[in-house]
Every structure is written in structure tokens, then in C-alpha cells.
Amino acid sequence: MAGRHALVWLREDAQWQAVTSGAQPRLQQWFAAGLPAVVARGDGSQAPGTLRLGVPLPPSEGKQRLALQAHVAGIARCTAPLTLDAVMPHAPLAVQPALQALLAQAHAHALHPHVFGSFAWQALTGLTYVHAQSDLDLLWSIQTPEQACAVLTLVQRWEQQHGLRADGELRLPDDNAVNWREYAGNAQQVLVKSNQDCRLLPRAALFPARSAA
């Protein structure tokens, strides 16, 4: 099944049910417009063969996040989160140079960040999500502690240079994720998010032991 942050488009005849009270009519409008939902973390309440999905509404609609459950059989298309280069043309013009600089720095380290949150939803919908205080939410897929350190250094330097704030997660080799700011701290345990739950794990357990050459 699709994991957290994946984008899902439903078939016209898909079976789904709003979890947020009173959200059914707005969700019907949303899907009728051909817009996607995002896969949320399972909480054990969903029926077999279903996914928990979310639809975050724009600030003009109160930034409410609408929750629903949908049958997997009703999925027409499922993709990874948008890439930073796909999001960039839809961002406010004032921040596009900073995003271009971040993309160039990431590529120099063979990193290819994906985007979720307000910048992604503005690109996906054409609606206004991004405002002056919006964070840039990034998902970095990494394989080693060295790559994690490279991401931390890159993002912290970028924030200082451009006066913008980046939030987001490091996606670990086992497909779990940890908030990059929390990883950058000194705590011996960090909160790790999977597709089913959240749990505290020792920092040393985040990367599998690599065999000696």
C-alpha cells in the first residue's frame, strides 16, 4: 500500500467515507475537480483494504484538514510527493530564487528532495496556500548517517542565507521518517514515524549496521 505523504487520485466510482464531521459535500467537490488526497498514517481504525487519507484546505477555508477513508480498489493513480523542481514554478516569485539555490545545492550532493505541505498543495491545486510565514516542508530520502548530516548542513546554511524556514523529514532506509530538526538535536532518542505509528527509538538504531568492507 501507499505510504505517508503519497498522493492519491480516486476513481469517480471510488468508495470512500468522510471521517471529519460534515466534510462529505466539500470532499465530493474536491474529488469532482480531479484533485488528490494525501495518504495519512494508519491508526488501526481503518477497515482492511482501506487507506486513511487527508485533504488540507487552503487558508481561505480555514486551513481545515479533512480526513477520510477510501478503499484501495478505488485508487486511480498514486504518486510520490512532488519534487522541488516541480513545485518551484508555482511558488511566489519572491522565493523562487531561494528555491532554485536549494535545488542546486541538493543536486550537488546527489539529493532529490520532495515537497509536501503548503508549497506542494499550491502547486497541485492552483489555490493559494503559501503566505509569508509558510514553511517549506521537505522530504529527504537518505541511506546513511553521512547523507543525513549533509542534509542538515545544507538546510541550515540555506535558512541562514535566505531568511526562510524549512521543515520536514528525513526518510530512512526502512521507509520510516524522523523530523530533521529533531535529528539535528542532541537527544539520544528521536520520534520515528512509520505508516502505522510513532515511537521513540535510540538514535543509534536509525540506520542498519553496515558490514565491514
Swiss-Prot record:
InterPro entries listed in its UniProt record: Holo-ACP_synthase, MdcG_C, MdcG_N
Nucleotidyltransferase among keywords: yes
EC number: 2.7.7.66
Entry keyword annotation includes Nucleotidyltransferase: yes
Highest rank taxon of the organism: Bacteria
Principal EC category: transferase
Active site (record annotation): D135, D137
Catalytic reactions of this protein: apo-[malonate decarboxylase ACP] + 2'-(5''-triphospho-alpha-D-ribosyl)-3'-dephospho-CoA = holo-[malonate decarboxylase ACP] + diphosphate
GO MF terms, alphabetically ordered: nucleotidyltransferase activity
Alphabetical keyword list: Nucleotidyltransferase, Transferase
Physiological role: Transfers 2'-(5-triphosphoribosyl)-3'-dephosphocoenzyme-A to the apo-[acyl-carrier-protein] of the malonate decarboxylase to yield holo-[acyl-carrier-protein].
HAMAP family for this protein: Malonate_MdcG
Entry's family note: Belongs to the MdcG family.
Entry protein name: Phosphoribosyl-dephospho-CoA transferase
Species whose genome carries this gene: Xanthomonas axonopodis pv. citri (strain 306)
UniProt lineage: Bacteria, Pseudomonadati, Pseudomonadota, Gammaproteobacteria, Lysobacterales
